[in-house]
Every structure is written in structure tokens, then in C-alpha cells.
Regions:
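Gly/Ser/Thr-rich phosphate-binding loop
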Residues: 3-65, 76, 83-86
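Glycine-centered tight turns that cap/initiate beta-strands
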Residues: 18, 40, 74, 170-173, ...
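Active-site glycine-centered loops adjacent to acidic/histidine catalytic or metal-binding residues
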Residues: 48, 69, 129, 153
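Active-site glycine/GP-rich loop and adjacent strand/helix microenvironment
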Residues: 56-59, 68-69, 88-90, 107-109
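Short Gly/Pro-enriched turn/cap motifs at secondary-structure boundaries
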Residues: 66-71, 119-123
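AMP-binding/adenylate-forming catalytic core of the ANL superfamily
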Residues: 77, 83-84, 94-103, 107-108, ...
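AMP-binding/adenylate-forming catalytic domain of the ANL superfamily
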Residues: 214-235, 256-262
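Acidic/polar alpha-helix N-cap and adjacent early helical turns
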Residues: 243-262
Length: 262
């Protein structure tokens, strides 16, 4: 929502409101200053889920813009590897969380005992989110584990690619999913919704991505949609996009002969 507001043409009345703080999940760091300068609003982010609570928050003093912040009082969080061993600072892993109060989290999934045991194993709730904890203790979201992309030996965050695409002035929304590569692993497929009246070409998007993303993370495929499939609470239904995959209407960077600069 923040990137949509920032892309709107300036309005002399845009600061005539009583809002001072706004919750802005998944907002890139540069937009924090844009929101403050244009609208006089301080943005706050964090991490929570239906099963848990607000475990991380940038309301913790000193948290950098674009991060998920630090651990809120009454909770604990860490980053672990596939063996549930704590990952070194700066290396990605799964976010696991727990609470000091036994009733601050849900007690499990109704009539799904196996799923409950899997999620709450080793006395930590396993979130399914891939994050990094930096040297200062701040948490940074990387991707959903199930949405991570592996291309030619490189790990790619769909979240990072989506943030760059969404920053394009002609893009209203974007979602990125992996599709099978001919030589194994994945290729990057981007679904893009343009702003009303805008008609960016796939080449325009490539040129915009090149100085902002590692070359291996730049989408090979681009598909323009009128809208993204969403759940009732507004989350992108990526499984539907993965099922759709590459279609006849999908632009292919390699077939188009677009050469990336390195």
C-alpha cells in the first residue's frame, strides 16, 4: 500500500490527516523516508502470525527501516538451520519463536495433531519464514521457505525481486515464483500488474532491474496480469501462480535475445 501511495501524484492536501503511525508490512527501506517526508507518517513493521503474536517489531528502539526489528518483551526468537541448531549471525535460516506466557500463542491446529507436532517441535514454533539476524540483533525477512528460488547454484529471494519490480513507477503489484529450469533447479517468473494507463515493456522492467538486482535474480520470464490472485485477507495466492507457470503469452528474456549486463 505504501508504494501505491508514494507513486501517486503530489497533492497539496496529502498531509491533512491525523495519522501519525502506520503499520506497513513488507515495505522497502527507502519508502520509510518517502512516507515521512510526504505524508508526515512514521512507518512501523514487525513479525507476527495467526498462530503466534507480535514477536518482532521495529517499534523496538533503534530498529533500522526495512527490517522486522527486534524481539518484543515477553517473547523469544532465533534463526535455526535444518537441524534446529542456531544459525550464526548474518546467515539465513528459519525463524522460530516462543513465548514466556503459555497462552500468548495458540495451542495447536484443531484436529491436526501431526501438523501441530511438526510446527511446535523442540518447544519452538517453526514459522516457515527464512530470515537473517544481523550482527546488531535485528531480524530481516528473506522469503517464505516454500517460495525460495534456487537458480544455477544461487539462492534468490522472491521477496527482494518483488520489491524491486514494485518500485518501478509503472508497476502496481508484482509476484515472483520459481518455474523448473531445463538444466535443473529453477528459473524466475514474474507476474506483473501495471498501473492504470501504463504500458511498460518487459525490456523496460529488465533495464530497471539490472542496476538493482544481482544478474542471476533478474526474471527470465514476465507475464502481465490485470490482477494477482489474492486470499480473502489480501495475500497473494502463489500456488495458483506456480500452477499457471509459463504460458504461450509469457515473455521469455532468452528467446527475446535480451542480454543482461554484468
Amino acid at each position: 500500500m505504501v508504494h501505491v501511495l508514494v507513486k501517486r501524484d503530489p497533492d497539496p492536501d496529502e498531509r491533512r490527516h491525523s495519522v501519525r503511525i502506520a503499520l506497513a508490512p513488507a515495505t522497502p527501506a527507502p519508502l520509510y523516508e518517502d512516507a515521512r517526508a510526504r505524508f508526515g507518517i512514521e512507518l512501523v513493521d514487525g513479525w507476527g502470525s495467526t498462530e503466534t503474536n507480535v514477536v518482532l517489531s521495529t517499534a523496538v528502539h533503534g530498529a533500522p527501516a526495512g527490517s522486522k526489528g527486534g524481539i518484543t518483551p515477553g517473547f523469544d526468537a532465533r534463526v535455526v538451520d535444518e537441524h534446529d541448531e542456531e544459525a550464526p549471525r548474518g546467515l539465513p535460516g528459519e525463524l522460530v519463536v516462543r513465548s514466556d506466557d503459555p497462552y500468548a500463542f495458540s495451542l495447536g491446529y484443531n484436529r491436526l495433531p501431526e501438523k501441530t507436532v511438526e510446527a511446535w517441535r523442540n518447544l519452538w514454533f517453526h514459522t516457515g519464514d527464512r530470515v537473517v539476524r544481523d550482527a546488531d540483533g535485528w531480524f530481516w525477512f528473506v522469503d517464505r521457505l516454500k517460495d525460495s528460488i534456487r537458480r544455477r547454484g544461487e539462492n534468490i529471494s522472491s521477496y527482494e525481486v518483488e520489491a524491486v519490480l514494485a518500485a518501478h513507477p509503472d508497476v502496481a503489484a508484482a509476484a515472483v515464483v520459481p518455474v523448473p529450469a531445463e538444466e535443473g533447479e529453477d528459473e524466475v517468473l514474474a507476474f506483473v500488474v501495471t498501473r492504470a494507463g501504463a504500458e511498460p515493456s518487459p525490456e523496460d522492467l529488465m533495464a530497471f532491474c539490472e542496476p538493482r538486482l544481482a544478474y542471476f535474480a533478474i526474471p527470465r520470464y514476465v507475464e502481465f496480469l490485470s490482477e494477482l490472485p489474492l486470499t480473502p485477507n489480501g495475500k497473494v495466492e502463489k500456488y495458483r501462480l506456480r500452477e499457471r507457470g509459463v504460458a504461450a503469452s509469457t515473455w521469455d528474456r532468452e528467446q527475446a535475445g535480451y542480454a543482461l549486463r554484468r
